[in-house]
């Protein structure tokens, strides 16, 4: 059926390497965040026709731009540019006080609400944030899913990304405020916050904000899409909430 060739057809679209970050940095005081520009999305995954909002903080306040890319093979470039939004007015948004069980739950003002176009194929999408004053950059990551049957289901490990996310400073599922690595209960994490630096060994990793997708999962997606495998993408949240689908 025509659906079987969706990934192969998608990867015939012009590719680009502009999805890569050119300049980023980690605040030495926190060791985990890029306060010049950082953000998160209202949803971890979304379907075509549904809306997703982006929440961005720029410190100091300045304008910024959002460029969204679908990640795949694309003639070896790794991504396809889906659109640009901006310049948008940014502002410094507050770091929340720790909630119950050390939960970091940001309640930032949204900067952009986007309706996912009908022709955006299921996949992993990176929203590249570029702050105009310092040219600092970071990512917001989200998944576009669909309900079609495919030969392969690519499940992103976003629950794991979030479990190890220490944004803004030592607030992962394995931090209790006292031990370097904590293995007990009484700690919660959530998706209403940016992804901080985790296990990248560089001081300014060019994957800031993408969870652990670029580190561990993108190579498989790149390879599978290069061979035109029929696949669809989901989040850990999908298999947790809707295993029957």
Predicted regions and their residues:
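Proline/serine/threonine-rich low-complexity linkers at boundaries of modular beta-sandwich domains
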Residues: 1-36
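Residue-identity detector for threonine
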Residues: 5, 16, 24, 44, ...
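Ligand-binding face of N-terminal immunoglobulin V-set domains in extracellular IgSF glycoproteins
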Residues: 16, 35-63, 67-74, 79-142
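Generic detector of short, locally flexible boundary/turn motifs and exposed helical patches
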Residues: 18-20, 29-33, 89-93, 219-223
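Aromatic-Pro/Gly-enriched surface loop or interdomain linker
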Residues: 61, 67-71, 75-86, 134-245
